[in-house]
Amino acid sequence: MAKKVTGYLKLQVPAGAANPSPPIGPALGQRGLNIMEFCKAFNAQTQKEEKNTPIPVVITIYADRSFTFEMKTPPMAYFLKQAAKIQSGSKTPGRDAAGTLTRAQVREIAEKKMKDLNCDTVEAAMSMVEGSARSMGLQVAE
């Protein structure tokens, strides 16, 4: 018989840097989960990732206080800022450009994010990436 799911918890944790301090510890602790068990398992799975890359994680909490977690790909903004070599997006997107991206960079980001996006083709994923880039004040060069 399958375990009864009591809830889900979504967190964004830096790769290889999960520790019991806030915000991870209190979020897991108030749900009665073993904080150190999660931290060790998460850090072990993110060893191959670049340090401090933000990794979205969805934790499934069961009635017996056990859990499983699923890691997603890093946020699109992280990839866009890395590709454009900027620290943050434009304060006034649409007016001031924070940087530029090439179509090849957009395609590369779309292929990385494809499994987490709600689309079937790379072209559809590319249009989502371009929309996110525009909202950050990045221009896409042909």
Curated annotation (Swiss-Prot):
Organism domain of life: Bacteria
Family: Belongs to the universal ribosomal protein uL11 family.
GO biological process: translation
Gene Ontology cellular component list: cytosolic large ribosomal subunit
Protein name (database record): Large ribosomal subunit protein uL11
GO molecular function: large ribosomal subunit rRNA binding; structural constituent of ribosome
Function of the molecule: Forms part of the ribosomal stalk which helps the ribosome interact with GTP-bound translation factors.
PTM annotation: One or more lysine residues are methylated.
Gene3D superfamilies to which the protein is assigned, alphabetical: Ribosomal protein L11, C-terminal domain (1.10.10.250), Ribosomal protein L11/L12, N-terminal domain (3.30.1550.10)
CDD domains registered for this protein in UniProt: Ribosomal_L11
InterPro entries, per the entry: Ribosomal_uL11 (IPR000911), Ribosomal_uL11_bac-typ (IPR006519), Ribosomal_uL11_C (IPR020783), Ribosomal_uL11_C_sf (IPR036769), Ribosomal_uL11_N (IPR020784), Ribosomal_uL11_N_sf (IPR036796)
The encoding gene: rplK
Keywords: Methylation, Ribonucleoprotein, Ribosomal protein, RNA-binding, rRNA-binding
Subunit composition and interactions: Part of the ribosomal stalk of the 50S ribosomal subunit. Interacts with L10 and the large rRNA to form the base of the stalk. L10 forms an elongated spine to which L12 dimers bind in a sequential fashion forming a multimeric L10(L12)X complex.
